[in-house]
């Protein structure tokens, strides 16, 4: 019997409650054994803010998931030089864990970008994409995507960074404390 592992990639700059809820909902609704959080170094589709270092983002992720045994962090993309593509990461993971079915979790806002992903036609054969339904993002794409529902959470890392003084409610308590202690995102 194959293992079922979810993967949630992102910049996690900072990791927030919506990331946590997405992972929890995907795990529960799809019966996944564990969730791997996959922090990106240089996502090809985004400009990096550079606000928190790789180490700080990983530390915040660790704080967010430390009480959840079935949640782990995979830092392989942070170790790569240059751009890091999901295709390369998944090729490596499948080679390392051939007895595992991978479920790549994306927010509803990312579904419309799938056709632009590097080697997407190969990637959709390697993983099952899981789209988290969000009312504002109902874009259809020519790929099979498992959809899961979760309550609307209007949270984004960009908004949190831009208004850090009012972001406490959107962050796990330990992540908020870390941001204050390390004076990230202008928080003094």
Curated annotation (Swiss-Prot):
Keywords on record: ATP-binding, NAD, Nucleotide-binding, Nucleotidyltransferase, Pyridine nucleotide biosynthesis, Transferase
- Catalytic function, reaction form: nicotinate beta-D-ribonucleotide + ATP + H(+) = deamido-NAD(+) + diphosphate
Broad class of enzyme this protein falls into: transferase
Q: In which pathway does it act?
A: Cofactor biosynthesis; NAD(+) biosynthesis; deamido-NAD(+) from nicotinate D-ribonucleotide: step 1/1
Q: What is its EC number?
A: 2.7.7.18
Q: Which GO terms describe its molecular function?
A: ATP binding; nicotinate-nucleotide adenylyltransferase activity
Task: Provide a GO biological process annotation.
Answer: NAD biosynthetic process
Q: Which Gene3D superfamilies match?
A: HUPs (3.40.50.620)
Classification via InterPro entries: Cyt_trans-like, NadD/NMNAT, Rossmann-like_a/b/a_fold
Supply the NCBIfam families for this chain. Answer: cyt_tran_rel, nicotinate (nicotinamide) nucleotide adenylyltransferase, PRK00071.1-3, PRK00071.1-4
Tell me, in a sentence or two, what this protein's role is: Catalyzes the reversible adenylation of nicotinate mononucleotide (NaMN) to nicotinic acid adenine dinucleotide (NaAD).
Give the family per the record: Belongs to the NadD family.
User: Any idea what this protein is called?
Assistant: Probable nicotinate-nucleotide adenylyltransferase
Species per Swiss-Prot/TrEMBL record: Listeria innocua serovar 6a (strain ATCC BAA-680 / CLIP 11262)
What's the source species' lineage? Bacteria, Bacillati, Bacillota, Bacilli, Bacillales
